[in-house]
Amino acid sequence: VLSDTNQAAGFLEVRPGERATDVFANAAKLSGIAQSEFDTIIKNKGKDILPNEAGGSFEGWLEPGTYNVKSMKSASEILKAMVDKRIAKLDELGVPAGSDRERVMIIASIAEAEVNKADYYGKVTRVIENRLEQGMSLGMDSTVAYGNNVKPAQVTTEMTQDESNPYNTYKISGLPPTPISNPGDSAIQAALHPEGGNWLYFCTVNLDTGETKFAATADEHDQNVAELRKWQA
């Protein structure tokens, strides 16, 4: 949440796991620069701002942190500051340059959206890698939600059946086309270095505490889902 003091001073806080559309809206509001200026840059696929591997999408490429947007003269200057910081951070974290960067951030963004505890990120990224390796669909609500511009809790069965959504990982094979948020350091490191394990499933069994259980078999996963249903009852 943006603190009142920072907002008043024109400082923008970009949070880990925040979607690019929210960052653009907050940046326009706090800087006083027209939203249309940001929209034009987005429409032009971040030309001269984004690296080639971003594929013309800002999602994932806006480094979390605090930015004095009030002091910046244009939407281009604001977005370039965020992207340049992101590139520097990826270098610092040792993320290989080139197309691997986009892959790492896609996986990191999914992990951050799926669970609310950094302790679980490495297990979620392992589940993703294991499922990809076995040719399984990812079946992640967070990606479906992103493609529908809703929160994961708002995903419906109908949405998971929609084959026209390129982010519907119940229907598409492999990874979605872009990251689904701007992941933070912990999630990126988890994507780079997944925990060792043979898990293929996970389920958050307590939505208050965020307790999440991981499973290697469908039967084991079904037991975890039953535990969630019991908690929800």
Regions found by a protein language model. Give the residues of each.
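Short, glycine-/polar-rich solvent-exposed loops and beta-turns at beta-strand/coil boundaries
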Residues: G17, T40-I42
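Bacterial extracytoplasmic/cell-wall-associated proteins, especially those involved in peptidoglycan
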Residues: K29-S36, T40, K47-A233
